[in-house]
Amino acid sequence: MYSIPWEEFLPADAAFPVTGSSLNSQLTSIPACQSVIKKAVVKRLMKGHRTTVLPESGVEYKVRFMLRKNVCEIMLDTTGEGLHKRGYRRNAMEAPLRETLAATIADLGRVRRDSLVEDPFCGSGTLLIEAAQKAMNIAPGLKRRFAAERYSFVPASLWAEQRQKALAESKLDVGFEAFGYDIDPAAVALANANAKLAGVEKRCHFEVADVADFAAKQEAIVLTNPPYGERMSTIEGAAKPVSYTHLRA
């Protein structure tokens, strides 16, 4: 661990918490491993930066380790928040659908550039927004920031270059259209706000409507995550039978 040139990656004031896991390895104590790795990094940084003080008051560089079958991998967390955090959903309704799961559902639904997609339980709009971004080839995470953007050894110009490249590959003139409905006006307002933040507000349309009045448009792909008791974390709701037999498609 000491042999890694940490001083080439971490400045003298870097904060560097150590976290990790162990699987099928002789070293099973995570706290002990954290302590050993931390001490090795500290010793190397002190030597590399020629200092006896490491204030850890600067940018955070999360050090992660993974022990698997007695082989240790050391990593720097370049992402920060989970990749499902796209950067456009500042707020969400109760029991929101993860963006990554919504993107997978859009894939399974075979959403294309000219698709018409509807969601009768749109909530904060995640399913339709992810479907729109897929249809328009908008890179996921384009609106968010990553931990490595603050790392001193990664040129800021690299991030700007890649973002410009991703923007250039977006297809904004597609025929895709999405329509979302929800009985809750607050959810509809939130969906509209999220769509605007995601840059797909011209392709995603949301309005207040009761699912009892829903009838899918001809040729529409219906993607939805209907509310149910267990997901909403209510014992009463989970005990009730749920029926959406009145839906017309």
Question: Which residues does each PLM region occupy?
Answer:
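C-terminal edge-of-domain segments
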Residues: 67-74
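Conserved S-adenosyl-L-methionine
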Residues: 97-215
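A short acidic, Gly/Pro-enriched loop at the edge of an enzyme's catalytic core
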Residues: 215-221
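Short, contiguous acidic/charged loop-to-helix segments that flank catalytic cores in large enzymes
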Residues: 211-212, 229-241
